[in-house]
Amino acid sequence: MVLSQRQRDELNRAIADYLRSNGYEEAYSVFKKEAELDVNEELDKKYAGLLEKKWTSVIRLQKKVMELESKLNEAKEEFTSGGPLGQKRDPKEWIPRPPEKYALSGHRSPVTRVIFHPVFSVMVSASEDATIKVWDYETGDFERTLKGHTDSVQDISFDHTGKLLASCSADMTIKLWDFQGFECIRTMHGHDHNVSSVAIMPNGDHIVSASRDKTIKMWEVQTGYCVKTFTGHREWVRMVRPNQDGTLIASCSNDQTVRVWVVATKECKAELREHEHVVECISWAPESSYSTISEATGSETKKSGKPGPFLLSGSRDKTIKMWDISTGMCLMTLVGHDNWVRGVLFHSGGKFILSCADDKTLRVWDFKNKRCMKTLNAHEHFVTSLDFHKTAPYVVTGSVDQTVKVWECR
C-alpha cells in the first residue's frame, strides 16, 4: 500500500511523537534525523497521541466490520430461505422469529397453558401456582390475576365470543369465568382425580374435560351438570379437543393412544396406536391445511369428495404424528425434537405445523417436505404450551421457567 507524501509526513510525525512521549530519546533523535523532520511545536501538538488513537480505532473498526459481516450473512440466509427481505411474503407464510417481543414474568410456578383471546388483544396463562393471569400481548402489560383454584391450573379455554373462560385444575374441579367481569360463575365437580384438560365446545353450550380418572366428561354450560361420560382410555387422559363443528372430540392418553369420539352417540370412532410413549397433546387440522396435507401424503379424496378430518398428536416418544381420522391411518411422523413434545398445532395458513417441547425449543415444520424449517431456542426450561393467533401475527409460549413469551411472526 503506497502512502502519499503528505500521509507519509503525518505518519512520521506521529511516530516521532510516540517515541518522544514514551521516553525513547535515542530512537527519537535518530528517527527525526533520518526522516528529516523539522521541529515545529504547533505541528507536534497536532500529532500528540495520534498513533495510539489510530491503533485503537482500527481494532474498533475491525470489530464493527465483523459484526456487520455476520448480520449480512444472516440477511442473505433469510433472503435465500424466503425471509422477510425476500419477496414480500404472504402472511399465510409468516413464522415466529427470534428474539421474543416480550418475556412476561409474574407466575411463581411453571406455566402450564397459554391461549389467545379470540377477540381482544389479550392472552391468558395458567400455572401450577393455582392462578390464571391475563396479559396484553401488544404492549406486554400484565392486566389481572384470576384466583379460585386451590391447586395447579392445568388447562384453559375460551368460547368463540371470548366472554366465557373455562379452566380445570388438579383440585379436581372445572371453573367457568365471566371474562367481562372476571368473576367465577360456576364450579363443576365430578371427576375423581386431577382434571388435565378442558375445552368449550364450538356451539358454546357444553364443555368437555379430561382427567387422570381415565374419563372424559361433557358438561352443560347453563346448569353445570355433567351430561355425558366417555370411557375407554386405560390410563390418565391428557388432553381433549373438539373438532371445528363439534361433532367429534379427540383425546390422548398415558395409554399411548389417541381416540376420536362421536359426540352424539359417545362411541369411539377411532383408536390410533402408533406412539411408543404417553401422548401429551393433540390438535385438529383446519380446513385451510387440507390441500397441503393431500399433496404431501397423496391421501385419496373419499367418495364424499371431502378429505379428512386430520389430527396431529405429539408424544413423549419425541415425535409428532399426523392422522387421517376417516381411515385411522398415520400419514406422517415428524422427527426432530430431542425430548417430550408438549404442544402442537397447525399454522393458520395451513402450510406449517408449530410445536414445542421439553428440549426448550419452539419449532416450525414444513410438513409438505416433512422437515423442520426453523428452530427457536425459546425458553430456559421445558416449553409446556403454545398458541398461534388466528388473525394477528403472534405466537405465545409458556414454560417451566415461569415465563410467558410473545413471538412476532413475519
From Swiss-Prot:
Gene Ontology molecular-function annotations? dynein complex binding; identical protein binding; microtubule plus-end binding; phosphoprotein binding; protein heterodimerization activity
Name the Pfam families on file: LisH_PAC1 (PF24951), WD40 (PF00400)
Enumerate the Gene Ontology biological process terms.
acrosome assembly; actin cytoskeleton organization; adult locomotory behavior; ameboidal-type cell migration; auditory receptor cell development; brain morphogenesis; cell division; chemical synaptic transmission
- Keyword set for this entry? Cell cycle, Cell division, Coiled coil, Cytoplasm, Cytoskeleton, Developmental protein, Differentiation, Microtubule, Mitosis, Neurogenesis, Repeat, Transport, WD repeat
Subcellular compartments: Cytoplasm, Cytoskeleton; Cytoplasm, Cytoskeleton, Microtubule organizing center, Centrosome
Database matches in PROSITE patterns? LISH, WD_REPEATS_1, WD_REPEATS_2, WD_REPEATS_REGION
Gene Ontology terms: cellular component: 1-alkyl-2-acetylglycerophosphocholine esterase complex; astral microtubule; axon cytoplasm; cell cortex; cell leading edge; centrosome; cytoplasmic microtubule; glutamatergic synapse
Chain ranges of the LisH domain: 7-39
Q: Which residues form a coiled coil?
A: 56-82
Q: Does the keyword Transcription apply?
A: no
- Describe the family membership recorded for this protein in Swiss-Prot or TrEMBL: Belongs to the WD repeat LIS1/nudF family.
Tell me the HAMAP family matching this sequence: lis1
The task this protein performs is described as: Regulatory subunit (beta subunit) of the cytosolic type I platelet-activating factor (PAF) acetylhydrolase (PAF-AH (I)), an enzyme that catalyzes the hydrolyze of the acetyl group at the sn-2 position of PAF and its analogs and participates in PAF inactivation. Regulates the PAF-AH (I) activity in a catalytic dimer composition-dependent manner. Positively regulates the activity of the minus-end directed microtubule motor protein dynein. May enhance dynein-mediated microtubule sliding by targeting dynein to the microtubule plus end.
What is written about domains in the entry's comments? Dimerization mediated by the LisH domain may be required to activate dynein.
PANTHER family in UniProt? COATOMER
**What does the subunit section of this Swiss-Prot or TrEMBL entry state?**
Can self-associate. Component of the cytosolic PAF-AH (I) heterotetrameric enzyme, which is composed of PAFAH1B1 (beta), PAFAH1B2 (alpha2) and PAFAH1B3 (alpha1) subunits. The catalytic activity of the enzyme resides in the alpha1 (PAFAH1B3) and alpha2 (PAFAH1B2) subunits, whereas the beta subunit (PAFAH1B1) has regulatory activity. Trimer formation is not essential for the catalytic activity. Interacts with dynein, dynactin, NDE1 and NDEL1.
What is the official name of this protein in its record? Lissencephaly-1 homolog
The primary gene name is PAFAH1B1
